[in-house]
Amino acid sequence: MSMIDYKREPKSDIAFVDMKSFYASVECASRGLHPLKTSLCVMSRADNSNGLILASSPLFKEVFGKSNVGRAYDLPFDIHTRKFSYYNAKRQGLSTDPAYIRFIEEWARATVIVPPRMDLYIEKNIEIQHIFQQYGSIEDIMPYSIDEGFIDLTSSLNYFIPNQSISRKDKLDMLSARIQRDIYRKTGVYSTVGMSNANPLLAKLALDNEAKKTHNMRANWSYNDVTTKVWGISRLTDFWGIGAAIEKRLEKLGIYTIKELANYSPDLLKKEFGVYGVQLWYHANGVDESNVHVPYKPKSKGLGNSQVLPRDYVKQQEIELVLSEMAEQVAIRLRSIRKKTTTVSISIGYSRFEESTSFRGQMKIEPTNQTEELQKYVISLFRKKYNGGAVRSISVFYSSFVDENITMLSLFDDPEEILKKERLQTAIDAIRSQFGFTTLQKANSLTSASRSIARSKLVGGHSAGGLDGLK
């Protein structure tokens, strides 16, 4: 029995709508294929074995046992020949039984592999947002990501379904079914809905833990379901907001289930986790005071950029060129929010054929947001750590921000020279903002190793128009 008096808790009618395998479903629909009956995956850089699987249809996941994110070399078949890959199978401990090989090759030939089209996904997301707005005001809608979001239907239920003999729970289900229908008719995408006549948390838990398994892809969790459904969640990490690190800390306290968390002392949880511990306790008891009408705005902890290179970079000069370009790209974002960084970090991932896997570096610096200075710091960090080898992925990250009007001068600094450089940087940013990033480029950006021009054409780090990896 919960210690919470739910009669005192606020109630709202919430639908949390999630597009089923969104990118893959959009690709299926655009080709006239059934999203649930087609084996399809969206793969960036499908022209090489390091191609990144961004999304896949439910059938693809079922057949090949893969989640959304993975690499082409994780598949049991060669993406070019569609033949069974004994090398990949051996590396992953898969069967090489002839029947299994035939099964994989049959499905490999039937599988559609397509490049990402980020502009199309954004276009479909906008269409879905317009559908949401037919059932609630803009203030009632809180996008959670490109393929999911909350709708507060509290004010809409009686408007769309005025029959007073129907319960609010049934009205919420009926209206959610209409939203599902409209999304499918407009976009060809199936959607799953977690519902709650209580709060957003329970709607999200209903989606993650039940709705995805029901025949109509809907489920409702409200206050009267807390002790049976919320406490019945089998794994701590299946609960919203609990990752592997938090799970380990909870287990050290002797907490292995959501029910145990809900009945633990909130004071002891606060002692271990601070205010977050109290929030965990309330959430485990189904209480959530977040408001869809006031979207959560996370405090910025840093800005970064990461990319997987199109090939192995072996020459140090080429690696440093990409590092410099990325240092500049993140510096531009830093200036756009009028901040300076005091901490620079890099992460370098080696080719999978190298013995070493990766290394990281970090340094504290005087506050700056100037491209030239940040490039020097990034390159300096790299040179301290790099001992040769083929590099395949690079990340640059700035953190520990201060306001841009803070400047630290030494006796050897020339204030006029600093001001001159800042004015030049401001002018360059303004030109690029109006006419595009590639308007002003250094000569080395035209070399084959450069990534700045290619990446300026991407949306969300991936191809906007679907030509990625195609000749």
What residues fall within each predicted segment?
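Catalytic palm subdomain of template-directed nucleic-acid polymerases
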Residues: 150-180, 254
